[in-house]
């Protein structure tokens, strides 16, 4: 399960070049390298699962027009999460014949991580609510229990838990 990520705040005009490089390195390149280096172990074991953690930011905000626009509120994070989703589906297609599943699981709320706790302390955003991490855990177990045909999916934890009664 690939779960490491960072958020780079700022607008296109204000973001530092090194921060763009950093979010690519951590949020997209990191999971791909982890998968690359774990792959021989899954092949040796005769199969397994990769679950890449994405975010609803991969599809947010959707088509315009937009109201109440806040500049610099996640375009870069959404960009790398969308890239991770696309890469995951491509790799699912490549690895299915080796009995290796690749799926994407996104929390639908904010999980209580150090980064989200920091955001919760932001005076501009004082009332963030957190999602219990157990829904991600239950959804992860369910995904891993599925047959090899269940690969290349982009899933959302709360929807999956509700749909499957987890």
Regions found by a protein language model. Name each.
Residues 1, 34-38, 42, 87-88, ...:
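Hydrophobic positions on the long internal alpha-helix
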Residues 2-3, 49-55, 61, 101-106, ...:
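Structural signature of the Rossmann-like NAD(P)-dependent dehydrogenase/reductase core
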Residues 6-8, 13-33, 51, 77, ...:
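Catalytic Tyr-X3-Lys loop
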Residues 10, 59-63, 100, 104-120:
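Short beta-loop-alpha junction of Rossmann-like oxidoreductase domains
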Residues 26-46, 57-58, 92-93, 97:
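Amphipathic alpha-helical dimer-interface segment in Rossmann-like NAD(P)H-dependent oxidoreductases
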Residues 30-35, 49, 59, 84, ...:
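Conserved internal alpha-helix within the Rossmann fold of NAD(P)-dependent oxidoreductases
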Residues 51-97, 109-110:
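Catalytic loop of short-chain dehydrogenase/reductase
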Residues 104-105, 122-166:
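C-terminal helical subdomain
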